[in-house]
């Protein structure tokens, strides 16, 4: 970990830039408007959303916003966050642009499917290796170790996964 990791205070999320995966759970089906993408049926399951954080506040600011939720709908994930519950997150501190690389690795995991084409991938359509979406659904769960081991750019020792349990569901109201 780098020096900025010492500045972390909220759930150990650093202020540095990096790539992350937000783990959300949807216990029952929802029909949901997703900004300009349109309205979609979201089936129950585990949802993993791949993003990057390179702006002010780094990973802590971006993950904090997603964990807490926001009244302002800016990103596609803000719409899903209205009905889905955070269950955890992966992250890697890095200045490398690994978002699409991680997304491609996640897309090849057993049981992964794309619930909404284009979800979270607005920036990808300008790249030669465009991603179909940055949101993946796993109906029957996923293997945390298998996923972590498949992420390029890191190793098991520097890719962090924090999982919330029914006994530990943090209060996200104190983060911005």
What spans do the regions from the language model cover?
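Cytochrome P450 catalytic domain signature, combining two hallmark sequence patches
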Residues: 70-75
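Short, surface-exposed, polar/charged, turn-prone segments marking secondary-structure boundaries
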Residues: 49-52, 76-80, 108, 116-119, ...
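GIY-YIG nuclease catalytic motif and its immediate N-terminal context
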Residues: 1-64, 68, 85-97, 137-176
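Mid-chain, well-packed structural core segment of small domains
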Residues: 79-126
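A sequence-composition feature that detects small, non-aromatic residues
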Residues: 3-6, 53, 61, 83-84, ...
């Amino acid at each position: 970990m780098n020096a900025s990791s010492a500045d972390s205070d909220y759930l150990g999320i650093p202020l540095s830039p990096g790539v992350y995966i937000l783990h959300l759970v949807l216990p029952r089906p929802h029909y949901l408007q997703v900004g300009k993408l349109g309205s979609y049926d979201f089936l129950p399951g585990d949802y993993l959303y791949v993003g990057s954080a390179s702006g002010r506040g780094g990973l802590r600011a971006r993950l904090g916003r997603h964990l807490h939720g926001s009244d302002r709908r800016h990103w596609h994930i803000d719409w899903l966050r209205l009905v889905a519950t955070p269950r955890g997150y992966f992250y890697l501190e890095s200045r490398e642009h690994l978002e699409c690389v991680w997304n491609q690795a996640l897309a090849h995991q057993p049981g992964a499917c794309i619930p909404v084409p284009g979800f979270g991938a607005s920036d990808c359509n300008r790249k030669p290796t465009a991603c179909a979406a940055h949101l993946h659904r796993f109906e029957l769960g996923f293997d945390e170790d298998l996923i972590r081991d498949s992420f390029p750019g890191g190793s098991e020792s520097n890719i962090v996964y924090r999982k919330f349990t029914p006994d530990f569901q943090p209060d996200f109201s104190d983060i911005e």
